[in-house]
Amino acid sequence: MAGFRSLARQVRDPRCDLALRRYSLRKCLERFAPYGHRATWDHLCSRAGFGPEDRSPDPARLVAALEELEEARSVWLAYEVEFAERRKKEKHDGLRRPGSVDDWHRLTWGGFGVAWCDDPRVHPDESLAEVLRRLISALEREPGAVCPACDGERLVWKYELDHEPSTGPVCTECGILVPRPVLTPEALADARRGRLLVSA
Protein backbone atom coordinates (compact mmCIF):
# COMPACT_ATOMS: atom_id res chain seq x y z
CA MET A 1 0.00 0.00 0.00
CA ALA A 2 1.46 3.35 -1.07
CA GLY A 3 1.96 6.11 1.47
CA PHE A 4 0.98 9.75 1.17
CA ARG A 5 4.34 10.94 -0.20
CA SER A 6 4.50 8.16 -2.79
CA LEU A 7 1.01 9.01 -3.98
CA ALA A 8 1.91 12.72 -4.07
CA ARG A 9 4.87 11.91 -6.34
CA GLN A 10 2.49 10.15 -8.74
CA VAL A 11 0.19 13.18 -8.80
CA ARG A 12 3.15 15.38 -9.79
CA ASP A 13 4.72 12.96 -12.28
CA PRO A 14 3.95 14.16 -15.84
CA ARG A 15 4.88 10.70 -17.17
CA CYS A 16 1.91 9.16 -15.34
CA ASP A 17 -1.42 8.83 -17.07
CA LEU A 18 -3.84 11.63 -16.12
CA ALA A 19 -6.33 9.10 -14.73
CA LEU A 20 -3.61 7.68 -12.44
CA ARG A 21 -2.65 11.17 -11.28
CA ARG A 22 -6.27 11.95 -10.37
CA TYR A 23 -6.68 8.54 -8.72
CA SER A 24 -3.49 9.10 -6.70
CA LEU A 25 -4.81 12.42 -5.43
CA ARG A 26 -8.02 10.68 -4.32
CA LYS A 27 -5.92 7.99 -2.61
CA CYS A 28 -4.02 10.72 -0.72
CA LEU A 29 -7.34 11.45 0.98
CA GLU A 30 -7.32 7.95 2.46
CA ARG A 31 -4.19 9.05 4.35
CA PHE A 32 -5.24 12.60 5.24
CA ALA A 33 -8.70 14.14 4.88
CA PRO A 34 -9.47 16.86 7.46
CA TYR A 35 -13.14 17.22 6.47
CA GLY A 36 -13.62 13.53 5.71
CA HIS A 37 -12.95 11.97 2.29
CA ARG A 38 -15.88 13.31 0.29
CA ALA A 39 -15.97 16.82 1.78
CA THR A 40 -12.18 17.25 1.49
CA TRP A 41 -12.35 16.13 -2.15
CA ASP A 42 -15.17 18.58 -2.86
CA HIS A 43 -13.21 21.35 -1.14
CA LEU A 44 -10.00 20.65 -3.08
CA CYS A 45 -11.85 20.45 -6.40
CA SER A 46 -13.68 23.74 -5.87
CA ARG A 47 -10.52 25.56 -4.70
CA ALA A 48 -8.40 24.20 -7.58
CA GLY A 49 -11.10 24.84 -10.19
CA PHE A 50 -12.20 21.43 -11.42
CA GLY A 51 -15.33 19.41 -10.82
CA PRO A 52 -15.44 16.46 -8.41
CA GLU A 53 -16.57 14.21 -11.27
CA ASP A 54 -14.12 15.65 -13.83
CA ARG A 55 -12.17 12.64 -15.15
CA SER A 56 -9.68 14.76 -17.13
CA PRO A 57 -8.78 17.79 -15.03
CA ASP A 58 -5.90 20.05 -15.96
CA PRO A 59 -2.75 18.50 -14.42
CA ALA A 60 -1.74 21.91 -13.01
CA ARG A 61 -5.05 22.03 -11.12
CA LEU A 62 -4.42 18.55 -9.70
CA VAL A 63 -1.02 19.71 -8.46
CA ALA A 64 -2.57 22.87 -6.97
CA ALA A 65 -5.06 20.71 -5.05
CA LEU A 66 -2.23 18.45 -3.89
CA GLU A 67 -0.18 21.44 -2.70
CA GLU A 68 -3.08 22.68 -0.59
CA LEU A 69 -3.49 19.21 0.91
CA GLU A 70 0.25 18.91 1.59
CA GLU A 71 0.37 22.29 3.33
CA ALA A 72 -2.53 21.30 5.58
CA ARG A 73 -0.94 17.94 6.29
CA SER A 74 2.32 19.59 7.37
CA VAL A 75 0.37 21.88 9.74
CA TRP A 76 -1.40 18.87 11.25
CA LEU A 77 1.72 16.69 11.53
CA ALA A 78 3.55 19.51 13.35
CA TYR A 79 0.62 19.71 15.79
CA GLU A 80 0.71 15.94 16.34
CA VAL A 81 4.44 16.09 17.14
CA GLU A 82 3.80 18.85 19.71
CA PHE A 83 0.85 16.91 21.10
CA ALA A 84 2.93 13.73 21.52
CA GLU A 85 5.74 15.67 23.21
CA ARG A 86 3.28 17.32 25.61
CA ARG A 87 1.67 14.00 26.53
CA LYS A 88 5.08 12.41 27.07
CA LYS A 89 6.05 15.24 29.44
CA GLU A 90 2.71 15.01 31.26
CA LYS A 91 3.16 11.27 31.75
CA HIS A 92 6.69 11.84 33.00
CA ASP A 93 5.29 14.38 35.48
CA GLY A 94 2.72 11.84 36.69
CA LEU A 95 -0.36 13.05 34.79
CA ARG A 96 -1.64 9.76 33.40
CA ARG A 97 -5.24 10.75 32.88
CA PRO A 98 -5.79 12.54 29.56
CA GLY A 99 -8.12 15.56 29.33
CA SER A 100 -11.02 16.23 26.97
CA VAL A 101 -8.71 17.57 24.23
CA ASP A 102 -6.76 14.33 24.45
CA ASP A 103 -9.94 12.27 24.13
CA TRP A 104 -10.91 14.25 21.04
CA HIS A 105 -7.41 13.94 19.61
CA ARG A 106 -7.47 10.15 19.99
CA LEU A 107 -10.44 10.07 17.58
CA THR A 108 -8.64 12.19 14.98
CA TRP A 109 -5.13 10.76 15.06
CA GLY A 110 -3.61 11.02 11.60
CA GLY A 111 -5.83 13.93 10.62
CA PHE A 112 -8.87 12.10 9.30
CA GLY A 113 -12.03 14.04 10.08
CA VAL A 114 -10.28 16.65 12.24
CA ALA A 115 -12.86 19.19 11.09
CA TRP A 116 -15.52 16.69 9.97
CA CYS A 117 -18.13 17.96 7.51
CA ASP A 118 -21.07 15.56 7.36
CA ASP A 119 -22.47 17.18 4.22
CA PRO A 120 -19.67 16.95 1.63
CA ARG A 121 -20.93 20.07 -0.16
CA VAL A 122 -20.79 22.27 2.96
CA HIS A 123 -17.29 23.07 4.19
CA PRO A 124 -15.16 26.13 4.99
CA ASP A 125 -14.07 28.32 2.07
CA GLU A 126 -10.60 29.06 3.45
CA SER A 127 -7.59 26.88 2.71
CA LEU A 128 -7.34 23.62 4.63
CA ALA A 129 -4.13 24.81 6.31
CA GLU A 130 -5.78 28.02 7.55
CA VAL A 131 -8.76 26.12 8.96
CA LEU A 132 -6.42 23.69 10.75
CA ARG A 133 -4.34 26.56 12.17
CA ARG A 134 -7.52 28.13 13.55
CA LEU A 135 -8.66 24.81 14.98
CA ILE A 136 -5.29 24.11 16.62
CA SER A 137 -5.23 27.63 18.04
CA ALA A 138 -8.70 27.06 19.53
CA LEU A 139 -7.57 23.77 21.08
CA GLU A 140 -4.66 25.55 22.77
CA ARG A 141 -6.68 28.36 24.40
CA GLU A 142 -9.65 28.61 26.71
CA PRO A 143 -12.96 27.32 25.32
CA GLY A 144 -15.16 29.81 23.48
CA ALA A 145 -18.67 30.11 22.08
CA VAL A 146 -18.06 30.24 18.31
CA CYS A 147 -16.89 27.94 15.54
CA PRO A 148 -13.08 27.95 15.48
CA ALA A 149 -12.98 27.60 11.69
CA CYS A 150 -15.19 30.52 10.65
CA ASP A 151 -16.19 32.32 13.88
CA GLY A 152 -19.78 31.34 13.15
CA GLU A 153 -22.08 31.85 16.12
CA ARG A 154 -24.88 29.46 15.11
CA LEU A 155 -24.11 25.95 16.30
CA VAL A 156 -26.76 23.23 16.15
CA TRP A 157 -26.55 19.82 17.79
CA LYS A 158 -26.78 17.06 15.17
CA TYR A 159 -27.32 13.35 15.58
CA GLU A 160 -26.43 10.29 13.48
CA LEU A 161 -23.35 11.84 11.90
CA ASP A 162 -21.19 9.55 9.75
CA HIS A 163 -18.27 10.06 12.10
CA GLU A 164 -17.14 9.41 15.65
CA PRO A 165 -18.47 11.08 17.72
CA SER A 166 -21.76 10.58 15.93
CA THR A 167 -23.41 13.52 17.69
CA GLY A 168 -22.21 17.01 18.39
CA PRO A 169 -22.33 20.72 17.62
CA VAL A 170 -22.23 21.53 13.91
CA CYS A 171 -21.59 25.03 12.59
CA THR A 172 -24.46 26.08 10.33
CA GLU A 173 -22.16 28.45 8.41
CA CYS A 174 -19.19 26.26 7.46
CA GLY A 175 -20.55 22.79 8.26
CA ILE A 176 -17.81 21.44 10.54
CA LEU A 177 -18.44 19.26 13.55
CA VAL A 178 -16.97 21.58 16.17
CA PRO A 179 -14.71 19.75 18.65
CA ARG A 180 -16.40 19.85 22.06
CA PRO A 181 -13.20 20.82 23.93
CA VAL A 182 -13.11 24.20 22.13
CA LEU A 183 -16.59 25.18 23.35
CA THR A 184 -17.75 26.35 26.76
CA PRO A 185 -20.41 24.32 28.58
CA GLU A 186 -22.84 27.17 27.85
CA ALA A 187 -22.11 27.04 24.10
CA LEU A 188 -22.65 23.26 24.11
CA ALA A 189 -25.95 23.70 25.98
CA ASP A 190 -27.04 26.41 23.51
CA ALA A 191 -26.28 24.07 20.60
CA ARG A 192 -28.40 21.36 22.20
CA ARG A 193 -31.23 23.83 22.79
CA GLY A 194 -30.94 24.95 19.16
CA ARG A 195 -31.49 21.33 18.14
CA LEU A 196 -34.63 21.18 20.28
CA LEU A 197 -35.97 24.38 18.70
CA VAL A 198 -35.26 23.12 15.17
CA SER A 199 -36.98 19.78 15.80
CA ALA A 200 -40.01 21.33 17.56
Predicted regions and their residues:
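Short terminal alpha-helical segments
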Residues: M1-F32, L128-L132
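Charged, low-complexity interaction regions
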Residues: R12-L20, Y35-H37, P52-S56, V114-V122
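Short, charged early-sequence alpha-helical segments and their helix-coil boundaries
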Residues: H37-V63
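Residues immediately within or flanking Cys/His clusters that coordinate Zn2+
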Residues: R141-G144, G168
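Short cysteine-rich clusters marking metal-coordination/redox-active sites
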Residues: C147-C150, C171-C174
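Short, non-ligating residues that shape and space the ligands of small metal-coordination modules
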Residues: E153-W157, R180-P181
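Short linker/helix segments within small regulatory modules
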Residues: K158-G168
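Short metal-binding segments enriched for Cys and/or His
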Residues: G175-A191
